Structures are given as C-alpha cells and as structure tokens.
Amino acid sequence: MNTTLNQIREKSPCTDGWEKLLKSLNKTEADDEPLSLITVLDSNGLDDAVWCLESVKGQDRQIILYSVWCARQVQHLMMDKRSLDALDVAERYANGLANKKELAAAMDAARAAGWDAARDDKSSAAWFATWAAESSATSVVTGFAAMSAARAATDLAGKSVWPEAKVAAMYAQEVKFREMFCGAMKS
C-alpha cells in the first residue's frame, strides 16, 4: 500500500517525524513518487506509519479493519456492551453490511460508554478499552482513528504490571500492520 510525500505533507506531520522520513529517503522536499508504508514503518516506526494511514486514499476498509483488530486485542476489558457493539458495527461497515447512520449511532454509544467508565472510575483499563472501541468506530470519519485504537491498546498494555505486555502489544500491532498494509513480515 502506498502514499506519497505530498499526501503525507498535506496532513501536517510532526516536524521530527517528517524530517526523519525525508532523511531516510535522502530527500529534502515532498514529491509525488509512490511511497510504500513499509518504508515509512522501517524508517520511522509504527506510530508514524499508522499516522500515515491518514494520507492513504481509497483504503478505508483496511484502515477500519486494522482499527477494529487493535481494539479487539483489549476487548476482554470492555465492560460495556456498547463498546463491543461499536466494534461489531465498525467491522460490518467495513464489510458493507452496515451504513453510516448505524456507524454514527454505534460511535455515539461507545463514546457515552467511555464517559460512563471514566465517571465511574471503576477501571482505567476499561476506559482505555472503551476508547479503543470508539476510535475504531470513528475510523470512517477520520483515518487517524487507527492510530487512536492502536495507541489505546498499547497504552492499556502499558498499564499492566508487566512492562513486557506493552512491548508485546506494540509488536503484535506491527506484525498486523505489515500483514494488512505491506503484505509482508519483517525478516
């Protein structure tokens, strides 16, 4: 899957990430040459590669499915059915089985579940998991939601008593990213 430097630049990337990418490509300015997401991933890491999904055109289905996959990694912590429903609706939408109105309703419900979890303060883990679900549902509205879902899942793993859980979550997200957007595993 490809983007271009001009498409990335249109989305106002952070200065550090932008300069790092240009340097890795031995370039000083944006152009319209196809740029593989695997190149971005290998140069800048997962956060920037996921962020660059915002610049990819015509791949909403894959972006939504990646967001849902990330959120499903922490779905066992989702205490509110509205969050689980949002994942199901986002997945159905990506597969052409739900419409935008259904998706918007699911997104609103997941957002309300997140506020309820935050208000009840029963579990920060539940709040992060709910945030991941709501982010997945908003992928249609903004491709940036893929990063939100991935970040929520990673942050949630980071709350674990085992630091290795965060590393494992990031690794799993990178493997899935390579599979879905790059068609390959890093050897």
Where on the chain are the PLM-derived regions?
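Short, glycine-biased loop/turn motifs at secondary-structure junctions and
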Residues: 1-187
